[in-house]
């Protein structure tokens, strides 16, 4: 019992084979698209995939369906992996529209930087007239790209509602800042003077170096925000289309 065995999460191709294996014993509708299914799911373990498929089977049986369809799979993935509520909370149209615009901003910037990278996106309405959401990126992106993507939601809302500061973006901004610091530490994106000193595991820095690094990070944050706005302007029709689709679905 003194040995440690490292187990890696399934890859996309692994996940598709695992899902196919578990679905062999279940009745499945032709509407289930295996490629779309593997793109929308996060797969940390085989057990997690099996649980999702079993929950989808239970949902289909409860609705007295002849087999599992894509709607069952999407509903279970939303609930199990992204915390969606079973019953849709009542949220105002304005909140839904801003939430949809925010998530569409992330999605459009992500697709502009890395085509085909978004596997799933949805709104997550919640109590107290709030609406969050997410995009699931199924391809690897660099720290610099992640920073621009994180700022896409804020950029989209502030481009549409000129003069307003987008609400609920603190986590996105924190994510962007951390990505900028990681890129500076690992890739030297802010010059060699900040290389290997700006990650979460950094040792204590001198006061002058800390001031210099913070100034560089803030400047990079502004530059990436400008890039996000530029990408959204170049893809205005796509942004409108995605926003409308999210508003229509609401979840």
Describe the role of every protein-language-model region.
Residues 60-84, 117-125, 191-201:
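Conserved C-terminal helix/linker of AAA+ ATPases
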Residues 95-100, 107-251:
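Soluble catalytic regions of large protease machineries
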Residues 7-72, 153-158, 186-196:
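Conserved C-terminal "switch" segment of AAA+ ATPases
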Residues 1, 15, 45, 56, ...:
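Residue-level signature of catalytic and energy-coupling elements of molecular machines
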Residues 66, 70-111:
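Conserved catalytic-core segments of large NTP-driven translation/proteostasis enzymes
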Residues 20-23, 42, 54-57, 61, ...:
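Signal for well-folded cores of large energy- and translation-related assemblies
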């Amino acid at each position: 019992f003194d040995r440690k065995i490292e187990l890696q999460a399934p890859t996309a191709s692994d996940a598709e084979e695992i899902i196919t294996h578990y679905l062999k014993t279940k009745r499945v509708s032709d509407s289930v698209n295996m490629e779309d299914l593997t793109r929308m799911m996060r797969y940390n373990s085989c057990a997690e995939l099996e649980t999702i498929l079993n929950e989808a089977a239970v949902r289909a049986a409860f609705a007295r369906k002849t087999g599992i369809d894509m709607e069952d799979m999407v509903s279970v993935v939303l609930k199990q992996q992204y915390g969606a509520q079973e019953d849709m909370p009542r949220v105002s149209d304005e909140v839904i529209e801003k939430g949809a615009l925010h998530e569409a901003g992330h999605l459009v910037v992500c697709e502009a930087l890395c085509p085909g990278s978004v596997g799933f996106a949805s709104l997550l309405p919640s109590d107290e007239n709030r609406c969050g959401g997410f995009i699931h990126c199924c391809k690897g992106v660099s720290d610099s790209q992640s920073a621009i993507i994180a700022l896409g939601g804020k950029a989209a809302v502030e481009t549409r509602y000129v003069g307003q500061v987008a609400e609920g973006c603190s986590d996105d901004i924190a994510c962007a800042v951390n990505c900028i610091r990681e890129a500076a530490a690992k890739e030297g994106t802010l010059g060699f003077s900040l290389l290997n000193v700006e990650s979460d595991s950094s040792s204590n820095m001198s006061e002058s170096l800390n001031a210099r690094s913070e100034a560089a990070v803030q400047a990079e944050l502004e530059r990436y925000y400008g890039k996000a706005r530029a990408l959204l302007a170049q893809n205005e029709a796509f942004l409108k289309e995605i926003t409308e689709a999210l508003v229509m679905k609401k979840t």
